[in-house]
Amino acid sequence: MKKLLLIAATSATMLSSTLSFADGMDNEWYLRIGAGAAMFNKEKDEATSVKLKSNMTVSVDLGIGYYFSKNFRTDLTLGTIIGGKLKKSGTATNVPFSGTNVSVSYKPTITRLLINGYVDLTNFNIFDVFAGAGVGPALVKEKITYNGITGLASTTKNRTNISYKLTLGTSAQIADDVKVELAYSWINDGKAKSKNVVYQGQKVQIGGMRYQSHNLTASIRFDI
């Protein structure tokens, strides 16, 4: 947690310094609220070798941003996911679980703080098309359950990773000082912590799942 606060403070300082540089420009701040759907990439449980699939989860974020020019803006966003899960039932092939029918579930908790930059690629009368990228710290932990194998269920501690985000979207003005946007984003939040447990006298590594997601988000921006 201390590491996340340190990185957050550094991010805020960088954003503040950049805004001070642009103080002489006639630009505006904005608030951004977004929500949408997300799906994680398919991954494999290392303990059993069962390949896991993602459910459809909800992503939300809240941010404050600044227009540096007509075609460039940046914002600082705090985001998380709600109800995300990687799960699958199958037959384990790894020792000591070989031949065991098991249902595996990974439920992550992810909180990320990102500095994002966006550039308008086109400017039409009705809408704009933009591309963007973001980077910042992410706290990642997971709850792991194994139905069919006793003694493996576990919850890992938070791990601080560097999260990366790539975005392509479109925006339109619907009222004075109000814009809506629809965007696709790919986000890499890194790996959760792994841990060793003893099962029938053997050490078994569980956890350590990598979380990469595809996101479709609808947002609204209020100029302030």
Curated annotation (Swiss-Prot):
This protein's record includes keyword Disulfide bond: no
Domain of life: Bacteria
Pfam families, sorted: OmpA_membrane (PF01389)
UniProt organism field: Rickettsia canadensis (strain McKiel)
Protein name per its UniProtKB record: Putative adhesin A1E_05320
Keywords recorded for this protein, A-Z: Signal
One GO CC term, this protein: cell outer membrane
Residues in the signal sequence: 1-22
The keyword Signal is assigned to this record: yes
